A protein has these predicted regions:
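Beta-strand C-termini and the immediately following turn/loop, strongest in propeller blades
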Residues: 106, 166-176, 209-211, 219-226, ...
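A structural "domain/chain start" motif
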Residues: 17-63
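C-terminal/domain-edge helix-coil "capping" segments
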Residues: 18-35, 123-194
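Amphipathic beta-strand/beta-sheet edge segments enriched in Tyr/Trp
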Residues: 85-146
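Short, solvent-exposed, polar/charged sequence segments at loop or secondary-structure edges
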Residues: 48-61, 65-109
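Multi-bladed beta-propeller domains
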Residues: 79-80, 186-203, 234-252
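Conserved beta-propeller blade repeats
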Residues: 138, 153-159, 199-222, 241-243, ...
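Structural motif
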Residues: 111-113, 174-183, 227-233
């Protein structure tokens, strides 16, 4: 056992060293502010009814919220007339002009025109024009594509609002055997569509990147059609599919490069 005198001598030295050495503080950024986006109200023009226009703008708002990349503020006035000419001092005091970006939607006839205004530079950019058909199921995808263009303008990177999700749903046939088919749904959970009609067991569907042509795209999946699991390739607009590889044995869990070339 050490002599108590030994500890008594060490204690003043320890207290002296701690009093001279300040604590080390490492600041960590735990909250990163998002770019602010002011969603301008738009005048009640255009050929569509108020309810339909509200539904269209609600889809656009939901895409902004679902991106988790923007701090959204919904406006109650139409900002576009204020930014179309020289900026007046009273206008600068509005909340919209303290935002990083102002979204300017506008209906003209059957078309939705979307612009993006940057208060810092007093610049307005045309994002795109959407010819609406009056069917929300079809127009929804067009609005998703418009938001992806907004996302690219702000962040210089494609958004994912217009992407689709593939999944398999397992069911029991009349003989009690389990089968499954591949379904498609938009990223917001709408427009569910069955894209295969097999009497087999299908699993792990993956969309092939950069294969989209019009409304169609290629995808790969695993099928137990031939007994052993094999990787097949299909197209969303065609009911048929073909084996992707001629290798023997089990083929499971296909993976693709980001470009879809490997």
């Amino acid at each position: 056992m050490r002599n108590p005198l030994f500890f008594a001598m060490l204690l003043p030295m320890f207290l002296l060293s701690t009093s001279k050495t300040p604590p080390i503080v490492v600041p960590l950024e735990t909250v990163k502010s998002l770019p602010s986006l002011y969603f301008s109200d738009c005048s009640s023009t255009g050929e569509w009814g108020a309810n339909y226009k509200e539904s269209i703008l609600e889809i656009l708002k939901d895409d902004i919220d679902a991106s988790f990349h923007l701090d959204l503020t919904m406006g109650k006035i139409d900002i576009e007339p204020l930014v179309s000419g020289p900026m007046k001092n009273p206008s600068k005091e509005l909340a919209a002009f303290s935002s990083d970006f102002v979204l300017l939607p506008k209906f003209e006839g059957k078309t939705l025109i979307v612009k993006l205004y940057e208060p810092r530079f007093h610049q307005t950019h045309l994002i795109g024009k959407v010819d609406l058909g009056g069917t929300l199921v079809e127009d929804r995808q067009k609005i998703h594509q418009i938001f992806d263009l907004v996302h690219k303008k702000i962040f210089h990177q494609e958004g994912i609002a217009s992407t689709r999700i593939l999944f398999c749903k397992k069911t029991e046939d009349i003989e009690g055997d389990w089968i499954s088919d591949i379904y498609e749904v938009q990223q917001d959970g709408h427009n569910l569509k069955k894209i295969t009609s097999s009497q087999n067991y299908l699993i792990t569907p993956i969309m092939i990147p950069n294969s989209k042509k019009g409304e169609g795209y290629d995808y790969v999946f695993v099928s137990y059609e031939k007994g052993q699991p094999k990787i097949f390739k299909g197209n969303s607009l065609s009911p048929s599919s073909t084996p992707l590889l001629s290798l023997r044995g089990n083929q499971l869990l296909p993976a693709l490069s980001l470009r879809g070339d490997k």
